[in-house]
Amino acid sequence: MKAKEIRDLTTSEIEEQIKSSKEELFNLRFQLATGQLEETARIRTVRKTIARLKTVAREREIEESKANQ
């Protein structure tokens, strides 16, 4: 998911995406440990997606705090 697509989401949608991505990452790591994972690069892409989601969420938190001051 691109940063532009993430910025179009609402804050609650971003939080939901973070939650589902973390679950996916957990499952991928479990598959890797048991030797069932064939597409190991998927772990990297999910981690980067989580980072993008968290970055946009934090940007919004900062904007809200600036608006309240």
Swiss-Prot record:
<dbReference type="InterPro" id="IPR001854">
    <property type="entry name" value="Ribosomal_uL29"/>
</dbReference>
<dbReference type="GO" id="GO:0006412">
    <property type="term" value="P:translation"/>
</dbReference>
<dbReference type="InterPro" id="IPR050063">
    <property type="entry name" value="Ribosomal_protein_uL29"/>
</dbReference>
<keyword id="KW-0689">Ribosomal protein</keyword>
<dbReference type="GO" id="GO:0022625">
    <property type="term" value="C:cytosolic large ribosomal subunit"/>
</dbReference>
<dbReference type="InterPro" id="IPR036049">
    <property type="entry name" value="Ribosomal_uL29_sf"/>
</dbReference>
<dbReference type="GO" id="GO:0003735">
    <property type="term" value="F:structural constituent of ribosome"/>
</dbReference>
<dbReference type="Pfam" id="PF00831">
    <property type="entry name" value="Ribosomal_L29"/>
</dbReference>
<comment type="similarity">
    <text>Belongs to the universal ribosomal protein uL29 family.</text>
</comment>
<protein>
    <recommendedName>
        <fullName>Large ribosomal subunit protein uL29</fullName>
    </recommendedName>
</protein>
<keyword id="KW-0687">Ribonucleoprotein</keyword>
